[in-house]
Amino acid sequence: MKRILLPLEDTERSLKAIHYVKKHYPPEDAELVLMMVDESLGYSVKSEAENQALKELDEKLETIAQSLEDYKVNTVSAVGKAGVRIARTARETGSNVIVMTKSSKEDMLSSIGTTAEYVINNAPCDVVIVSEAANSKNEYRGLVYR
């Protein structure tokens, strides 16, 4: 069984990674680890603001997990630099593959972004970057780095 790490954010683009996983990995062959990272707080000592941010991320992840009822789903919320947290979580969870989208910034549409680049260079497993563009059959195309 493959353990798939899905780093998500609050964008519709991010949900394409979920569609990719549903299409390519049947529930009986995959265990999903949904992850969200709040980069706004940085690395600080545990504070009330961090606890509140983690609580909000957990609520969002739970909502997304409910839409994946056929899959075994675990959730991870974190505060800090997204790329670092994603690579660390992949190691800690024993993930076999990370499926993520490229940059969510509108001015970075032709680039994969710094977070994806960091993950590709530091992940202990394969990384699939799901393309935003769909081909003529509305199938997602992606790249596998390793």
Positions of predicted regions on the chain:
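General small-molecule cofactor/ligand-binding pocket signal
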Residues: 33-35, 74-78, 128-130
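Glycine-rich, Arg-bearing micro-motifs that act as flexible, cationic patches
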Residues: 100-122, 132, 136-138
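Short, surface-exposed alpha-helical segments at coil->helix boundaries
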Residues: 47-62
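Small/aliphatic-rich secondary-structure junction motif
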Residues: 1-47, 51
